[in-house]
Amino acid sequence: MLLVVDVGNTQTHFGTVRDPHSPGGGELFERWRFATERVSSADELGAALRNLLALRGLELSEIDSSIVSSTVPELGPEWAEMARRYLGHETVVVGPGIKTGIAIRTDNPREVGADRLVNAVAAFELYRSAAIVVDFGTAITYDVVSDDGEYLGGIISPGMEISLEALWSRAAKLPVVELGEPRALIGKTTIDAIRSGIVYGFAGQVDGIVGRLRAELGSDAPAIATGGLAHHIVPTYTESINVVDELLTLKGLQLVWQRNC
């Protein structure tokens, strides 16, 4: 069984895959999310993994291979060490030198985030055409793949929760507001007005940027939304997103693993 791990700045999303060598990818058997702790040790990660697997009737011994992508530099080595100690193998860590199967057409390929690359791999594998991936996490990233399966680059903007935090931390009279659905476009309270601004503001950003990217590509490329916060605005408040795929990054990790093992 294959363990696929996506370590984000805010959350870590991971799952197990049975029959990972099957063409096009095996079935994702189980998956979990937990808060990313930047000071986690290999032993803490191993204990957490053992406990979560046990809740689903699984054991560490059933995992015979793994792959990790991490946007938190200090946690990649800890996951690799955890795999050595608790799983008994060397994990694949997505980074420079890893075979992705796509050409990276950016000025500095080494600076492209691992999660963004595996999203691009999954998008092209699924659609075999130009594609746009919108990943809603700590930041909102837009990544573009060409008709030839090349990673062309993308766009990074502050995420919804970062924007909320900036409002209440920089504006003295504004309250702390949790991300949530607005009751109406025109807010009747300060909280409603803030939620409306975040949700409709980011929905407008998504539709505007996706439209411009399609014009740049010269095609009606499919737009795929993913990430832990996507459900707050997609598909209810957006018009440009074709598909919501919460598992896109994990699917991409499995594909990259296949190309390296």
Task: Show which residues each predicted segment covers.
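Short glycine-rich, Thr/Ser-proximal phosphate-binding strand/loop in the N-terminal lobe
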Residues: 1-51, 149-175, 180-181
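Short glycine-aspartate micro-motif
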Residues: 2-6, 67, 131-135, 224
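ATP-binding/phosphotransfer module of carbohydrate and carboxylate kinases, centering on a glycine-rich
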Residues: 2-5, 36, 40, 166-261
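Short beta-strand scaffold segments in enzyme catalytic cores
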Residues: 12-17, 133, 140-145
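Short, well-ordered amphipathic alpha-helical segments that serve as non-catalytic structural scaffolds
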Residues: 44-56, 205, 209-210
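Short beta-strand-loop/turn "lid" adjacent to the catalytic site in phosphate-handling enzymes
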Residues: 54-112, 148-154, 159-160, 188-199, ...
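Conserved phosphate-binding catalytic cores of ATP/NTP-utilizing and phosphoryl-transfer enzymes
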Residues: 100-131, 254-261
